[in-house]
Structure formats: structure tokens, C-alpha cells
């Protein structure tokens, strides 16, 4: 494209997306007017879902293509700012949109590891990888590994790692799609998954990277508006200020004060004591599960007969009968139930129900900071998590592929800057939102009588007891903080209702979360399908396949992968961020050493890269798997999990990356130097002219 053509293309994009933004604002205002006129909530939620998905589908349909360059890299003509916006949407997954504020609510200072790690990772992308990958100028990350190191093995390992990492991550996005769609429409979680899945497929299936790019720009506009509006509005209602980032210190001071009051509250301590007794009871049941099953059945039967004898209300009798029907029928089911009861009771018996104090650094949930060893362990895990997220961000295939789409190397570097700016805009708001939600819970919810609990809490409890849950543990009829459990995944979606904001804002947030999940799912599905169609099918299985045939095969892989991810997500994974962290650890261990060495170390060779990737993956995945109690039980090992330096399994990349680096360096030095064509490629990567694949 000539300079004049590029300028006109960019101006046309400015006009179109400015009009689109005005249209989004007008649509929200129209639905706000409809709410005031009496529209039912499911009409408003359905309108948000239908309108946004139709817009994304329209962009995908308009951008459909079978051209190879357009399908894989959007024709390499995406302006830096718009690629930055698309990258931010690709990045702002369900985990970022839904989980970041939630984890800051639950973990306080410890949750900042996610923000530091993710934003720091983009600095590594800008300095170490993005410009050089754009200069390389092919389609995928396995493409780079195959061209730089030669042979089949580096490319094949790259394909396997890209598919594994991206599939773990896309399952989380589909889970988020199901959660948000069910919130918008009232559908069940499983139906919500497959309804939302249509919005994912229509973009990535029809137009590949071209459709995904322009859809992601539109999705970023929706998600950033959806995140910032409730933050500003809640702060206005709580402090009277329009500038939340400058004034939410007021709410933070109140939160810190209330935490101290709750820790000293006799009613809270009574609730903790009752939970501790329940934990001991669950432990006793686990000692002899069959006997515990008999005892539970007899106890419930006695309670039912006593209620009937006392002519108790029918609702109370029916409640006991439902409890009898829900009793586990097998020993395995009973053991799983007692283990869940034990985990819940142990967490709720901790101070503040296991929620960390908001401003206290390096303290595990429930700990008051008096144990030096606990603080040391928390500090190690904080730094390990930051390390894994930074390295994983710099090695995530669906992120790096975006920098193939710019018009030049300079645009690729500028694009990283734009990406970081658009991402930071949301990440600056997340800590403020977490504090505002906790302020609302402490000042408006805790201390409320159970008969006056807000409708939003009842509705979320009905949707999924794992997301929101209350129980009058001490029987005083007043909600204590230890009798409340809110999952991190639902806090952002429920925040507008907590703050008493209009219903249209609640559904705007849900639409933003849907945009975040759809945008990342699109990018991940495309990464998986391209790895399978381009790197496996074309480069290894059938090198004579035509471009049209490869594109069609990629579309088929999009469909198959989406259905598989939907099935796994329908199993209702618990918590978003642990799965995301695991994906980043795997990406860091698999790709980061080989990619950076491929650019900056001429002596790195095929054998070194192959062994380095395999060793890094093996150490990382092995540490994760062996840390799982179920795996240890299956292997007949002691139930106590393995913890090197007390590092959590999800941060296994802190061991996998160094292991991969050591293996890559040693094997490269002990085996013959790379072939001249691969050395020449390294030299060309460091010079301005474009690079062509050499294998």
C-alpha cells in the first residue's frame, strides 16, 4: 500500500468506528429510556445480546475471505493504533474483564501480581519479539520456529504447545461466554454456552484474521465503555466525584477500617467457631465414609419425623425431603461431598472468611501477617506469579500473531505501545472497582437481616450456588461477613446492581464481558486452527495443498475446536484465573526461551531448541500435575502436595523457563552449529530488509 492509500484507509476506519461508537452510546441511551418506560429485564438483556452479536456477525460476514494472506494475517495492512486496539480486545479475555477486579477483591495486594505481570509482559513483547516476528513476515509462531531452527521437530512441538496452551485458554473464554449469556437471557449455563458460541464462530469461521481484527476493534469499544461507566457511576454515588482514580482512596480507608472492626466483632468470631466445628465434623466423616452416609440418612429421617410430629410448616418438611433426595448414593459421591464441605468450612473459618486484607502485602488469605514464614511464602508466590505472567504474555501465540498483521516493522513496535495503552486503561480501573465493591459489601450488605437481602444476591444464588451463597450460620437472622461467599467470577457482573445502578448499566457490563470473552475466543480459535491447518497439515502432511484448501481446512478446525471447548466448559470449571495462570506458565516454558534465543543467539540450533522446549514443558506440566491431590492419590503417593520452595502449581513456569533455558544452551553448545542459512536468517532478522522462510 502506498502512503496515500494507507492514509485514506486509516481515515475511513476513523469515520466508521467513530460512527460505531456513537451508535453504541445511542443504543444504550435508548435502552435506558426503555427501562424507564417499563421494559422487563429479560427484554433489555436479550436486546444487548442480540444487538451486539448481530453487529459482530455483520462485521464477520462483511469481512469474509478465502484469500490466504487476508485469512491468516489480515493482508498485513492493519494500522498500528487499530492493531493495538484489536490486540487489547484479544488480550482482554473473560479472565481480565471478569476476574481481575474479583481477584483484587479476594486477594487484595496479592492480586496486583496479575496486573504487573500482564502489563510487564508487553514490555518484553516490544523489546524482544514483536518487531522481529513482523520482520520475519510469515503467518504463525510454529512458522518462525520451523524457519529459524529447520526440520520438522521444532515446528511440530510448537504446534502441540500452541494448541495445548490456546485450548486451555479458550475453554476459559467459552465458560465466560456461558456465564454472561445466562446472566443476560436467563438461559441455563449450558444453553448460554452454545448460544454465545454462535457469536464466536461467525467471526473466526468466515473471515479468519481479517474478520477477527475488525470485530475485535468493535468489541474493545464496547468492553472499555462497559468497564468504565460503572466505575465512574459507582464512585459518583459513593463519593460524589467523577474521577474515581483520584478519589477512591476514601473508600479504601473505610474498607481498611471495617476490616479491623470485623476481625474484632464477636458475632464474626462466633461464626468462625461454628465453621471450625463443621470442618472437624467433615474430617470425621472422611475417616469412615460409609458410616457417615448411614448417620446422615438416619439424622435426616429423624428430623423429618420430628417435623411431621410437631405439625411443622409444609415448606420446612419439603426442605428436609429435598435434602434427603440430594444425599449421595455412592461412597465416591459422598467422599467428594464431604471433601467440598471440608474445604468450604476451612475457608469460612478463617478471619474475614479467607478474604485477604485489602492493603496488606504478601499475606495469604486468612492470615493476619504475624507468621514470617507465611509472609515469605506469599512473597515468593507473588514474584513467581509475576514472572510466569510476564514470560507467558511475551510467548502467547495468539498475541504474537497479531504483530504479523501490521504494514511494517515500525508499525509493529508502535502497535505494542498502543496495545499497552488500551490495556492499561482497563487495568487502572480494576483496583478501583474492587475497592468500591468491597466498600459496598461492608457498608450496605454486611449487617443486613436475612429477610431484607437484596434481590441481586438471591438471583445469583439461584443461578449457581458456587457464584453467590449465604447461610445464617449462627442463627441470629443477621448477615455476617463469614456467612457470605461471593465468587470472583461474578463480582464485576454484579457490581452495578450492588451499587444500585440502573438495570441498563448491569447489562452493559454483561455485554462488555461478552465482548471480552468473544474477542479472545476468536483469536485463540484462529491460533489453534491455523497451527493445525498451516503448520501441521500444509507444512508437514500435505505440502501440495492449495491455499483455498488450507483455508477451508482451517475453518473446519475452528468448528471442531469450538465444539470441543464448549463441551469442556459445560463441565463447569471452578474459577477462571487459576486456569489462565496455568496456560501462561505453559506458554512461557514452551516458547519463551526458543523464541528469544532464535532472535538473539546465533549459536542456538535445532537440537537445543527441541530439547529446550520439551524439557521446559515437561518440568512445568509435571510440577502442575504432581501437585494435584487426585493425581497423587491415583499414583498411590502421599496426599501432601509437592511444593518446591512453597511455589503454587499454577506458577510452575518459574521452574519450566529456567529448565528450558539451561537445556537449550547446553544442548546447543554440545551439538553442531546451525546451518549457514539459519545463521543468515538471524542476521537478516536484525537488519531492516524483510525475511523469507528458509525451510
PLM features per residue range, with description:
Residues 1-695:
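Membrane-embedded helix-loop-helix hairpins and adjacent transmembrane boundary segments
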Amino acid at each position: 500500500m502506498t502512503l496515500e492509500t494507507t492514509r485514506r484507509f486509516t481515515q475511513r476506519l476513523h469515520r466508521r468506528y467513530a460512527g460505531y461508537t456513537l451508535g453504541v452510546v445511542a443504543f444504550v441511551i435508548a435502552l435506558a429510556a426503555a427501562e424507564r418506560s417499563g421494559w422487563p429485564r429479560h427484554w433489555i438483556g436479550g436486546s444487548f445480546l442480540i444487538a451486539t452479536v448481530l453487529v459482530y456477525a455483520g462485521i464477520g460476514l462483511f469481512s469474509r475471505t478465502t484469500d490466504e494472506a487476508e485469512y491468516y494475517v489480515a493482508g498485513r495492512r492493519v494500522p498500528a493504533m487499530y492493531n493495538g486496539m484489536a490486540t487489547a480486545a484479544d488480550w482482554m479475555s473473560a479472565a481480565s474483564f471478569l476476574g481481575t477486579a474479583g481477584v483484587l477483591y479476594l486477594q487484595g495486594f496479592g492480586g496486583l501480581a496479575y496486573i504487573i505481570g500482564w502489563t510487564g509482559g508487553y514490555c518484553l513483547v516490544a523489546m524482544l519479539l514483536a518487531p522481529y516476528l513482523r520482520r520475519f513476515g510469515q503467518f504463525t509462531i510454529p512458522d518462525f520456529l520451523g524457519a529459524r531452527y529447520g526440520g520438522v521437530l521444532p515446528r511440530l512441538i510448537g504446534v502441540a504447545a500452541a494448541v495445548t496452551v490456546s485450548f486451555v485458554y479458550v475453554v476459559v473464554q467459552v465458560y465466560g461466554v456461558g456465564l454472561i449469556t445466562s446472566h443476560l437471557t436467563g438461559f441455563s449455563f449450558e444453553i448460554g454456552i452454545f448460544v454465545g458460541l454462535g457469536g464466536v464462530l461467525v467471526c473466526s469461521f468466515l473471515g479468519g484474521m481479517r474478520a477477527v481484527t475488525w470485530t475485535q476493534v468493535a468489541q474493545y469499544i464496547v468492553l472499555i465503555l462497559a468497564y468504565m461507566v460503572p466505575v465512574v457511576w459507582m464512585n459518583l454515588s459513593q463519593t460524589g466525584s467523577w474521577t474515581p482514580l483520584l478519589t477512591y482512596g476514601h473508600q479504601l480507608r473505610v474498607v481498611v477500617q471495617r476490616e479491623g472492626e470485623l476481625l474484632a466483632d464477636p458475632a464474626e468470631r462466633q461464626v468462625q467457631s461454628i465453621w471450625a466445628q463443621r470442618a472437624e465434623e467433615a474430617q470425621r466423616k472422611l475417616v469412615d465414609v460409609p458410616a457417615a452416609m448411614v448417620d446422615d440418612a438416619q439424622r435426616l429421617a429423624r428430623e423429618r419425623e420430628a417435623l411431621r410430629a410437631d405439625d411443622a410448616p409444609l415448606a420446612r418438611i419439603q426442605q428436609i425431603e429435598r435434602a434427603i433426595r440430594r444425599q449421595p448414593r455412592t461412597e465416591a459421591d459422598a467422599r467428594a461431598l464431604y471433601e467440598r464441605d471440608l474445604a468450604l468450612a476451612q475457608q469460612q473459618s478463617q478471619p474475614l472468611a479467607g478474604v485477604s486484607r485489602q492493603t496488606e502485602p504478601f499475606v495469604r488469605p486468612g492470615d493476619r501477617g504475624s507468621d514470617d514464614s507465611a509472609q515469605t511464602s506469599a512473597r515468593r508466590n507473588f514474584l513467581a506469579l509475576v514472572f510466569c505472567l510476564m514470560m507467558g504474555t511475551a510467548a502467547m501465540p495468539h498475541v504474537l500473531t497479531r504483530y504479523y498483521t501490521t504494514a511494517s516493522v515500525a508499525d509493529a513496535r508502535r502497535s505494542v505501545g498502543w496495545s499497552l495503552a488500551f490495556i492499561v486503561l482497563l487495568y487502572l480501573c480494576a483496583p478501583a472497582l474492587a475497592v468500591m465493591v468491597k466498600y459496598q459489601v461492608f457498608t450496605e450488605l454486611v449487617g443486613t437481616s436475612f429477610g431484607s437481602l437484596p434481590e441481586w444476591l438471591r438471583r445469583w444464588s439461584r443461578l449457581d450456588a458456587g457464584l453467590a451463597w449465604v447461610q445464617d450460620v449462627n442463627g441470629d437472622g443477621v448477615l455476617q461477613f463469614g456467612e457470605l461467599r461471593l465468587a470472583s467470577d461474578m463480582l464485576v457482573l454484579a457490581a452495578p446492581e450492588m451499587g444500585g445502578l440502573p438495570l441498563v448499566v448491569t447489562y452493559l457490563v454483561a455485554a462488555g464481558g461478552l465482548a471480552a470473552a468473544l474477542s479472545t475466543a476468536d483469536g485463540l480459535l484462529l491460533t489453534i486452527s491455523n497451527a493445525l491447518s498451516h503448520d501441521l497439515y500444509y507444512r508437514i502432511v500435505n505440502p501440495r495443498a492449495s491455499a483455498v484448501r488450507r483455508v477451508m481446512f482451517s475453518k473446519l478446525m475452528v468448528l471442531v475446536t469450538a465444539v470441543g471447548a464448549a463441551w469442556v466448559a459445560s463441565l463447569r470449571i471452578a474459577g477462571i484465573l487459576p486456569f489462565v495462570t496455568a496456560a501462561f506458565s505453559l506458554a512461557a516454558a514452551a516458547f519463551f526461551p526458543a523464541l528469544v534465543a532464535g532472535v538473539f543467539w546465533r549459536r542456538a540450533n535445532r537440537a537445543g531448541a527441541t530439547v529446550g522446549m520439551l524439557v521446559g514443558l515437561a518440568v512445568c506440566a509435571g510440577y502442575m500435575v504432581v501437585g494435584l491431590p487426585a493425581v497423587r492419590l491415583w499414583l498411590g503417593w502421599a496426599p501432601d502436595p509437592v511444593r518446591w520452595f512453597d511455589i503454587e502449581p499454577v506458577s510452575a513456569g518459574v521452574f519450566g523457563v529456567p529448565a528450558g533455558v539451561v537445556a537449550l544452551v547446553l544442548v546447543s553448545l554440545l551439538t553442531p552449529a546451525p546451518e549457514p542459512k539459519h545463521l543468515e536468517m538471524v542476521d537478516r532478522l536484525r537488519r531492516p530488509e524483510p525475511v523469507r522462510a528458509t525451510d
